[in-house]
UniProtKB/Swiss-Prot annotation:
It is found in: Cytoplasm. The keyword Protease applies. InterPro entries: Leucine_aapep/pepB (IPR011356), Macro_dom-like (IPR043472), Peptidase_M17_C (IPR000819), Peptidase_M17_leu_NH2_pept (IPR023042), Peptidase_M17_N (IPR008283). The gene is pepA. This is Probable cytosol aminopeptidase. One of its GO terms (biological process) is proteolysis. The active site is at 263, 337. Belongs to the peptidase M17 family. Mn(2+) 1 binds at residues 256, 333, 335. The lineage of its organism: Bacteria, Pseudomonadati, Pseudomonadota, Betaproteobacteria, Burkholderiales.
């Protein structure tokens, strides 16, 4: 899908030939004398256009307009969130038709955030996954024109939004793939493909190299699968070599059965989404290649499957992590923290300015925050504030949760330096406390995306989160 930015007022939008014209109307809108304004005024007077934000009215072949369909969408006060809801509703109202060219017109000049929201919402509402379908019905909308009365100064923010969409959809593509279409080796292939782009390099380590590094925790998770593990290292070099990089660490469990601590059968298919953290890292790197910001970023992806086998790690086994700390594995379904802890130790060699890990880590985080906000954990107030701000700006929200030392009491064990689980209470926090033990040499944050990485039910599928949050954080830090 191609996005374009054009300067069009309402009069110009009325003359634009397209399959659908979406007009975004704030409550402050004052109709003029052009054909489109007259149409809006008539709809308001008749009560056909609801005053509630996010509501849309579809008109077919409206008189005086060049479009095949006009959609009048209420954006309330015009905030980014209201624009996002309105655009999604409008696109959903027309996408079943043969809409190839779509024009989204702001009736009044927007702020930057609502314009970005319109781009990302149009992409989300029209997204279709087709990779594993024999006769796919692909995305109908091919061209989206975003129209404002004066586009001067909007090009940088527009390009940023389009790059974010590109990254989000790349993350969705890989997270949505079934596990047999997204093995660790195939995921590594996707990372290697990114190395063809500007400023990106990729290195992939296999089992022997990981063993030499002493990543005993990562290897313990992988040993129950016939699919060999991969440790993916991506580099985006946009600044001088002397500039300390930010490290993004994505959990890459391409399928999680739970191991011997096996998961219930219901919804186990959704465990293909357990590599959504890794997918988000890939998406961010694709967006970085498009935008070329002056920063350095490292992407780390420990990838493997967590399956049952005669060689699978057993509850009670003790393994030695790359840091030298020993871990008693009391629950083999708490495997994400095991692959992440070795990757956190590996991150030390880059002397990073910050490390952010992204993982579908705990069901406890889903219980705490649902599917609205990702869980954020960090002992660094500045880093936490920057990530929260990035989430607010990008509408990819997170919520900071505590990391009090008392929460780590449950991780104590008589048989190793630390256990991989505590009790049920505060499970998202105790998981973060486990990771914190391996992140003492750099500013660190943990994003638990177990509730936000995908949707279940009739809308089942990856969301591409938190690509937008991470990209916003990186671009802001580059200023």
């Amino acid at each position: 899908m191609n996005f374009e930015l054009e300067t069009l007022d309402l009069n110009g939008a009325a003359k634009e030939k397209c399959d659908a014209l979406i007009v975004l109307l704030a409550t402050s809108f004052k109709p003029g004398k052009d054909n489109l304004s007259i149409l809006v005024a008539q709809a308001l007077k008749a009560g056909d256009l609801e005053s509630q934000s996010g509501k849309a009215l579809v008109l077919y072949r409206p008189t005086g307009l060049a479009c095949a369909r006009a959609v009048l969408a209420n954006v309330g006060e015009g905030s980014a969130n209201e624009v996002s809801k309105a655009v999604k509703a409008a696109v959903l109202a027309v996408k079943a038709g043969n809409v190839k060219k779509l024009v989204i017109c702001f009736a009044a000049l927007p702020q930057e955030a609502p314009l970005r929201a319109a781009v990302t919402a149009a992409a989300e509402a029209s997204y279709v996954f087709t990779t594993t379908k024999s006769k796919p019905e692909g995305r109908v909308i091919q061209r989206v024109v975003v129209a404002v009365s004066n586009s001067s100064g909007f090009k940088p923010v527009f390009d940023r939004a389009v790059a974010a969409v590109t990254g989000i959809e790349f993350a969705k593509e890989w997270a949505n793939r079934p596990a047999n279409h997204a093995t660790p080796a195939l995921l590594a292939g996707a990372a290697r493909s990114l190395a063809k782009l500007a400023n990106i390099k990729c290195e992939v380590l296999g089992p022997k190299q990981v063993e030499r590094l002493g990543m005993g925790a990562f290897m313990a998770v992988a040993q129950g699968s016939e699919e060999p593990l991969r440790f993916i290292v991506l580099r985006y070099d946009g600044a001088q070599k002397s500039a300390a990089p930010t490290v993004l660490l994505g959990k890459g469990i391409t399928f999680d059965s739970g191991g011997i601590s096996i998961k219930p059968a219901a919804d186990m298919d959704e465990m293909k989404f357990d590599m959504s953290g890794a997918a988000s890292v890939l998406g961010v790197f694709l967006a970085l290649a498009q935008l070329k910001p002056a920063i350095n970023v490292i992407g780390l992806i420990p990838s493997c499957e967590n399956l049952l086998d005669g060689r699978s790690v057993k509850p009670g086994d003790v393994v030695t992590s790359m840091s030298g700390q020993t871990i008693e594995i009391l629950n083999t379904d708490a495997e994400g923290r095991l692959v992440l802890c070795d990757a956190l130790t590996y991150a030390e060699r880059f002397k990073p300015r910050a490390v952010v890990d992204i993982a579908t880590l705990t069901g406890a985080c889903v219980i705490a925050l649902g599917g609205v906000r990702s869980g954020l954990f960090s002992a660094d107030d500045q880093l936490a504030a920057a990530l929260v701000s990035a989430g607010e700006s990008s509408l990819d929200l997170c919520w900071r949760l505590p990391l009090d030392d008392d929460y780590a009491e449950g991780l104590k064990t008589s048989f190793a330096d630390v256990a991989n689980v505590a009790g049920r209470a505060g499970g998202a926090i105790t998981a973060a406390k486990f990771l914190q033990r391996f992140a003492g040499k750099f500013p660190w944050a943990h994003l638990d995306i177990a509730g936000t990485a995908w949707k279940s039910g009739t809308a089942k599928g990856a969301t591409g989160r938190p690509v937008a949050l991470l990209l916003e954080y990186l671009l802001t830090s580059a200023k």
